[in-house]
Amino acid sequence: MSDSEDVALSELSSRNGIKKEDEEMPLAQLNGNGNAKLRKRKHSEKSKDDHKDKKRKKEKKLSKEKVNNKVKDELISAPVTPKKTPKISKTPVSATSSPAPKKEDSVETDEGYKWWEDENFGEGDERWQTLEHNGVLFPPPYEPLPSYVKLYYEGKPVDLPPLAEEVAGYFAAMIETDHAKNPVFQQNFFNDFLQVLKEGGGCNVDIKEFSKCDFSKMAAFFEKQREEKKSMSKAEKQRIKEEKEKLEEPFKTCLMDGRRENVGNFRVEPPGLFRGRGAHPKTGKFKRRVFPEDITLNLGEGAPIPPPPEGHQWGGIRHDKTVVWLAMWRENISDTFKYVKLAANSSIKGISDMKKFETARKLKDHIERIRADYQKMLKDQFMQNRQIATATYLIDIFALRAGGEKGEDEADTVGCCSLRYEHVTLKPPNKVIFDFLGKDSIRFYQEVEVDRQVFKNLRIFKKEPKGPGDDLFDRITPTILNKHLQNYMKGLTAKVFRTYNASKTMQDQMDLISNEGTVAEKVVKYNAANRTVAILCNHQRTVSKNHEQAVKRINDKIRELEWQKIRLKKMILDIDETEKKDNPKYFEELDDLTNDEMNVIVERVIERQKDQAEKKWNRDNEKRKMEKEELLTKADLQEKLDKIEETRKDYLEEIKTGVVRATKGSSVSSLKSKVETVENRIVNTSYQLKDKEDNSEVSLGTSKMNYIDPRLTVVFAKKFNVPIEKLFTKTLRDKFNWAIESTDENWRF
């Protein structure tokens, strides 16, 4: 999957979210007799759905929509063709392609279409019958730097060809980042920079060493651009946003079987320097610009072909109803295909998600037999069967990914089947230490107790002459393992265990939760259950640089609320001193904060109020300027700041005397009601703090989005009367609308 980090910082265009979907690639094929380890994955741009039961009963007529994807009339420099091109039948399309279709009012929108109530939806080989779309949105062409902004080599200014200048600019724009300080990143960048420089005809200086390059002038230019962007007025930002939305609008949706569906990633990735995750060997390499000639479109037969940018033509046109991508191209870094597909909230993606979770749910009917069988196979006389059983055990019990072989130019991440000698340490009688880099180069480190026979098998798998670098499971691959699992259940693969165990664990955790407490308390309980799943799946994350500041802000907020509560209770005593005699426990916390602590709180509150007043003054003036009204003066602002300063003096006087005068119109009952409100806020904020600290190193979102059946979250929301908005973000509510609409509180995984 493409990483949003790969967006070039020197581009002012928006981030792109192109995904690389593995389901478009065939399963790796075995060499020879099937026992040899697969050394290289074979890629293909085409894959077919496994469901072949029924065909759609009716073909819906497609209303035609006017294609409005006129691309800016800016010249695009000559394309750089990737090393390999897709082996597909190409239909060249010139810039004068078919006219755009007329838009009709009869187009059915996807909104409100409940595909999960259609028994035939998603069945059969063909995923759609009619498909129209407007192609893809290309990033803006490169804008050369001003003549005074140059790369320097040994103190001399360098006149670079346009493409070489562009590549140098990508490095300069991120020169202060950790990536740019990585020696591997620097070397890969410099190698590609020299190659691009050679392609462009060279320059006036003989550049040979990275250490002699001075990017400071370029870096300063990009920093100035960033500062200018930050200092834009609200009106300017709004104008840019509207222009961007207008440009993107034609590409956001497509027409599939007469319904308008959202497109998930309609932008072509901009060029830049590849970053990658973890210790990726290709970090820093130049990700080249993608041109129309590199792109193949998938459309319905007879559908109007979107016109390519002027002077270009599409690489090919396909009419493949068995796949759901709209466009594809080969990316030069990983030499794999990237696909433009429908959005997460589309009907096609929804049915895919539902089938995934239903497949995992069906596993509960087979899991006991599978476990009984692999326990027997652990002692099988054939070594391959022992390895299959041992791998299945590890995948089932410890939620390991299946894993596959990686090339030398890929990050050294592993899963169960690709574990090597050095990744497993054995401690008799039955303890195993796993230590390896998993997906996204996240370290998997666990010391666990395993079945005695599993321990014995692992010891056998590590026997001499094996040593560091040798495969532990040298008789199996994920393909062999999955073929074995297919005997138990249609669609069962190693990764289904992960979804099953994540959802089963969530169900078990939810069964332990009592329906008590406030909404905030229930959300914390839900997150604790989610965290158990995330830990099982090893969904870690690095503690953010801002974590300590975020925790401090929440702690400060709690202290401010405690101070507010003390002030309110002192107001009660100002009205009726006998309250303290009648209920001394209620007033015990009056001395919880020292005068020094309260002074610090007051200064913080006052500074925030002043800052808010200045920001509001600026916002109001922006609005008045747009509406051509008289602007507020500095005197107006100063008047507000003076009032805030008076409040500050009053607060400090309260701290000094210990007396807080009740506000006009206050009563004991109204003040007690306010105290209760503040106490509830303290409780809720404390839960927020606990959540923040508990989940600082655990990523809850990954398991919630990909592994926990969303219907479990819906059940929790309905059963415990928690608004679904507290558990699912807007994105997840859209993605899992099918679960929200079709699940009641009695559903079980």
Swiss-Prot record:
Alphabetically ordered keywords of this record: DNA-binding, Isomerase, Nucleus, Topoisomerase
GO cellular component terms, semicolon-separated: chromosome; nucleolus; nucleoplasm
Reactions accelerated catalytically: ATP-independent breakage of single-stranded DNA, followed by passage and rejoining
Positions marked as site (Interaction with DNA): 277, 325, 356, 413, 439, 482, 539, 557
Superkingdom of source: Eukaryota
Interaction with DNA: annotated segments: 338-339, 401-406, 493-495
Pfam entry (one): Topoisom_I
Ranges for domain Topo IB-type catalytic: 345-749
Basic and acidic residues: bias regions: 62-75, 101-110
Gene Ontology biological-process annotations: chromosome segregation; DNA replication; DNA topological change
Record's keyword annotation contains Isomerase: yes
Low complexity composition-biased segments: 79-94
Subcellular location: Nucleus, Nucleolus; Nucleus, Nucleoplasm
CDD domains, alphabetized: Topo_IB_C (cd00659), Topoisomer_IB_N_htopoI_like (cd03488)
Region of interest: Disordered: 1-110
Top EC class of this enzyme: isomerase
Matches recorded under InterPro entries: DNA_brk_join_enz, DNA_topo_DNA_db_N_dom1, DNA_topo_DNA_db_N_dom2, TopoI, TopoI_C_dom, TopoI_cat_a-hlx-sub_euk, TopoI_cat_a/b-sub_euk, TopoI_cat_euk
Documented EC number(s): 5.6.2.1
One MF term in the entry's GO annotations: DNA binding
Active-site residues, record numbering mapped to chain: 707 (o-(3'-phospho-dna)-tyrosine intermediate)
Function according to Swiss-Prot or TrEMBL: Releases the supercoiling and torsional tension of DNA introduced during the DNA replication and transcription by transiently cleaving and rejoining one strand of the DNA duplex. Introduces a single-strand break via transesterification at the specific target site 5'-[CT]CCTTp site in duplex DNA. The scissile phosphodiester is attacked by the catalytic tyrosine of the enzyme, resulting in the formation of a DNA-(3'-phosphotyrosyl)-enzyme intermediate and the expulsion of a 5'-OH DNA strand. The free DNA strand then undergoes passage around the unbroken strand thus removing DNA supercoils.
Family of the protein in this entry: Belongs to the type IB topoisomerase family.
Stated name of the protein: DNA topoisomerase 1
